[in-house]
């Protein structure tokens, strides 16, 4: 099945594409993104083959998918957060047509706040002296879980998550000090990734959720994401003459194109 991809290449004369200064804890949409949102809504309504209306029903789908994309296993949001977001559940369609993007940014900022609370818990409060002889149960599938009401309940859920990960390392004959270091390093890397999110990343995430709500084969690509997609599809960077492969979280040079810049620099 063909995949519908929306490419938006817009030049704004004299207008910065992003906010001048974005606080790490609070990201906000830009005027440019508001304009793009209205444009995407119009393009999807007019040209998508499904001819789906942007209405309350679609709004509920977008809401559920967006919240799930941030916290699919219910590890971060509290029940009060989700209840507070409910006022947007039937209104995202109208917001999209108007280019009003504050709600998805509010949801993301709350997610990042809750995420940081979890990282603080792992770093400063969690004791790694787990009793592996005690019978405990950890539900993995978020569909089988409810959002918890208090941070204390979330702490206990996370204690079991980390205990499960520690047990995996234990079965691999890792020492206790090594286990603690490896787990903290894992979440430090994740925290760095989340901390580096910019306004454009939140916009990309939300707009892609919106496009996929029309059908799973529709996507929104910003200009930067479009270029990255082309690179991934070709698995090469023509500019440097190198072919790349992925090795876990690292990118490796698989081969160098003869005669290219990378080859000449050898």
Go through the PLM ranges and name each one.
Residues 7, 17-266:
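Flexible, low-complexity junctional segments that flank or bridge functional domains
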Residues 4-13:
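Sec-dependent N-terminal signal peptides
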């Amino acid at each position: 099945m063909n995949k519908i991809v929306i490419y938006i290449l817009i030049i704004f004369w004299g207008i910065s594409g992003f906010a001048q200064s974005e606080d790490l804890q609070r990201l906000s949409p830009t005027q440019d993104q508001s304009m793009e949102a209205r444009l995407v809504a119009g393009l999807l309504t007019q040209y998508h083959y499904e001819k789906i209306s942007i209405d309350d029903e679609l709004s509920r789908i977008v809401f559920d998918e967006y919240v799930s994309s941030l916290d699919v296993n219910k590890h971060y949001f509290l029940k009060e957060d989700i209840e507070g977001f409910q006022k947007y559940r039937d209104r995202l369609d109208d917001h999209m047509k108007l280019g009003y993007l504050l709600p998805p940014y509010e949801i993301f900022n709350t997610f990042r706040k809750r995420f940081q609370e979890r990282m603080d818990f792992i770093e400063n409060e969690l004791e790694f002296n787990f009793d592996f002889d005690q019978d405990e149960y950890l539900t993995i599938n978020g569909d089988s879980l409810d959002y918890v009401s208090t941070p204390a309940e979330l702490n206990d859920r996370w204690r079991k998550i980390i205990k499960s990960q520690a047990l995996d390392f234990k079965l691999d004959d890792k020492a206790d000090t090594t286990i603690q270091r490896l787990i903290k390093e894992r979440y430090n890397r994740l925290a760095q990734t989340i901390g580096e999110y910019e306004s454009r990343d939140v916009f990309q995430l939300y707009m892609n959720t919106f496009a996929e709500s029309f059908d799973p084969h529709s996507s929104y690509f910003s200009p930067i994401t479009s270029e990255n997609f082309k690179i991934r599809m070709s698995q090469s960077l023509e500019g440097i003459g190198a072919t790349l492969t992925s090795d876990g979280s690292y990118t490796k040079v698989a081969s160098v194109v003869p005669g290219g810049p990378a080859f000449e620099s050898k």
